[in-house]
Amino acid sequence: LDVLLGGDDGSLAFIPGNFSVSAGEKITFKNNAGFPHNVVFDEDEIPAGVDASKISMAEEDLLNAAGETYSVTLSEKGTYTFYCAPHQGAGMVGKVTVN
């Protein structure tokens, strides 16, 4: 599943922002607009026992150019909340449910 970082209109958002995947399905986050973005999973908003640091980009790592990607595969079922560290305050937050 591909998730865009930033809307075509320049909005600071994940597109789609709320989605479901099967356990083990690869999710690819792709910078759509050329603003610096990243993908960090909220350690308090993921299934118990999952290590947020193993599925997240480091807060200081950024996808700077349009077309740059970060991929992750989630195997534990449940709901995961993630955000873009530079734009979390602007509401750039998303949620994925793993079935």
UniProtKB/Swiss-Prot annotation:
Q: What is this protein called?
A: Plastocyanin
Which CDD domains does UniProt cross-reference here?
Plastocyanin
What residues does the Plastocyanin-like domain cover?
Answer: 1-99
Recorded hits in Gene3D superfamilies, A to Z, give: Cupredoxins - blue copper proteins
Keyword Repeat listed? The answer is no
Where does it localize?
Answer: Plastid, Chloroplast thylakoid membrane
Classify the main location. plastid
Family according to the record: Belongs to the plastocyanin family.
List keywords of the entry alphabetically.
Answer: Chloroplast, Copper, Electron transport, Membrane, Metal-binding, Plastid, Thylakoid, Transport
Q: What is the lineage of its organism?
A: Eukaryota, Viridiplantae, Streptophyta, Embryophyta, Tracheophyta
Any idea what job this protein has?
A: Participates in electron transfer between P700 and the cytochrome b6-f complex in photosystem I.
Topology relative to the lipid bilayer, per the entry, is: Peripheral membrane protein
Q: Which GO terms describe its cellular component?
A: chloroplast thylakoid membrane
Q: Which gene encodes it?
A: PETE
Pfam families attached here? Answer: Copper-bind (PF00127)
- Write out the GO MF terms: copper ion binding; electron transfer activity
* Cofactors (names): Cu(2+)
Organism whose genome encodes this protein: Solanum tuberosum (Potato)
Binding-site residues, Cu cation: 37, 84, 87, 92
